[in-house]
């Protein structure tokens, strides 16, 4: 992620005066929720994952799913508040001196794009720690490489580099790619069937709300028709597969 941040700041210097400041302020504001979440939930998860790494795979996944449910209940409302009040928060904190109204709007636009990446930052931390607990240290390295590659494709291939809002959006989407890759590796380590059979209803509900949020995020992108279709189909398949496995499990018991 830090490499992406450096590239982002370098590209921002080529847009307009003050772009680096807008991105830096927006990024710092977005990390406030991240800091609260890490201090409150993610750090205690690390100890539980290390303790449960030698247990049954189903028990290990139940620990992950349980913590993800509680984190989603905290982080999603916080993200919604920041999205709704991004301009007001930026204006209250920084509208003084040479920081004018145009700077407020640019910073708030970047903040909105960064906010969508905050849940995926949390997932990256949790999935990485889970894979390390399972002695699969190579997978997080591969996922980080995929994140950097996807960011480069977005800013240079799709040319999302002509505004601070698009640069921040590319950074958030790269985090989404990284979290998805890590989740795929975790499914591979725990066996896909084990994970699907042990999804509780809170995790499924949080998955649905997260998919709705991501869909609306992708709706504003230039290539929304392609990504929205693929993501919507994938998340729908995953949701109904989880329901089917839980139904079959209840029938057996």
Where are these regions (language model features)?
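Membrane-interface helix-loop junctions in multi-pass transport and translocation proteins
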Residues: 138, 145-180, 184, 217-233
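Transmembrane alpha-helical segments of multi-pass transport proteins
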Residues: 198-252
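Membrane-interface junctions at transmembrane-helix termini in multi-pass inner-membrane proteins
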Residues: 116-146, 157
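Interfacial segments at transmembrane-helix termini and the short loops linking adjacent helices
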Residues: 83-117
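Interfacial transmembrane-helix starts/ends
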Residues: 24, 45, 56-85, 104-111
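Short alpha-helical transmembrane segments in multi-pass integral membrane proteins
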Residues: 70-84, 165-187, 237-241
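Interfacial/gating helices of multi-pass transporter permease domains
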Residues: 12-34, 102-108
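Helix-loop junctions and terminal segments of transmembrane helices
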Residues: 37-57, 61, 128
């Amino acid at each position: 992620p830090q490499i992406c941040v450096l590239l982002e700041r370098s590209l921002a210097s080529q847009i307009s005066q003050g772009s680096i400041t807008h991105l830096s302020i927006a990024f710092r504001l977005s990390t406030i929720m991240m800091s609260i979440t890490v201090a409150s939930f993610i750090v205690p998860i690390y100890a539980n994952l290390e303790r449960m790494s030698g247990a049954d795979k189903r028990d290990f996944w139940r620990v992950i799913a349980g913590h993800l449910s509680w984190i989603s209940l905290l982080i999603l409302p916080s993200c919604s508040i920041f999205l709704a009040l991004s301009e007001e928060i930026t204006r209250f904190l920084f509208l003084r001196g040479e920081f004018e109204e145009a700077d407020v709007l640019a910073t708030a636009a970047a903040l909105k794009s960064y906010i969508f990446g905050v849940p995926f930052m949390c997932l990256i931390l949790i999935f990485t720690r889970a894979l390390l607990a399972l002695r699969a240290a190579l997978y997080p390295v591969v996922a980080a490489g995929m994140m950097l590659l996807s960011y480069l494709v977005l800013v240079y291939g799709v040319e999302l580099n002509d505004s601070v809002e698009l640069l921040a959006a590319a950074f958030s989407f790269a985090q989404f790619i990284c979290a998805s890759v890590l989740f795929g590796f975790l499914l591979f380590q725990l066996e896909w069937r084990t994970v699907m059979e042990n999804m509780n209803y809170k995790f499924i509900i949080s998955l649905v709300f997260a998919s709705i949020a991501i869909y609306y995020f992708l709706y504003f992108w230039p290539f929304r028709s392609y990504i929205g279709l693929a993501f919507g189909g994938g998340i729908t398949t995953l949701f109904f597969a989880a329901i089917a496995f839980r139904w079959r499990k209840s029938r057996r018991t």
